[in-house]
Amino acid sequence: KNPKLVTYHKPIFNEKGDKAIIEIRSLDNKDRWITILDLKLGDLKEIDHQHDAAWIGGPGISGWNQSQGALGWLENDKSIWYQSEETGYSHLYKKSISKLKKTALTTGSYEVRNAQLSIDGINFYLTLNKKHPGNRGFYHLNYKTKVLTPILENDGNYKVKISPDEKDIAFLYSTMNQPWELYTSKNKPNAKSLKLTNSKSEQFIAYNWRKPSLMQFKGNDNVNVPARVYKPSKEGSNGAGII
């Protein structure tokens, strides 16, 4: 086989500074290598190889070969964490750099949309579409126990920013028929949130916004496709539909 043209991403150094995670992407967007560079030995070791005949990409992976995926060190630099679509969904994994033992930290018919490791290196702060493909909920994951704790899980979309000390969060929240608003709360389960904005006009509030029902239908590839259904009133219904 002919060698592939590749691009190297910026190094992610461990605390000692003697090793670095290097992500390598093929320019045809079909291969991704996660490697460890040992600066003392000048050695580059393959940790994980991902291949997709169509296109490498997805949440935490990046569909563009010049953009780095979500990566980092774990367990006092004995392991790394990363995301992969090997199951068809983007999930979180850890892998030891010595024995190359891989462990799935998340599994299921949903995707990890965003992952951030906590300061203490024990918990991941995750954005998941766990309840529905269109939702974006916020969760804590203890990667050692694999206990997943919901923090923000109502139907809709949460965009979360964590304070530097990780005690508080600020987030935008919207639903199917309500626009984005800004909130703050403690970064813990069942915390009371404080709404900071009210962006809706009087005309918007006065309008009777329809709340669609949710459904899924099979696509040509036999994969479920999520959709919203807006049903007309019985008086105006003629059996027609618009997709």
Predicted regions mapped to residue ranges:
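Non-catalytic accessory segments flanking enzyme active sites
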Residues: K1-N2, T7-I12, G17-S26, K30-I36, ...
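Short loop/turn segments immediately following the C-termini of beta-strands
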Residues: R25-L27, E85, S90, N129-K131, ...
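A short beta-strand motif characteristic of beta-propeller blades
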Residues: K45-E46, W55-G58, K101-T106, V147-L152
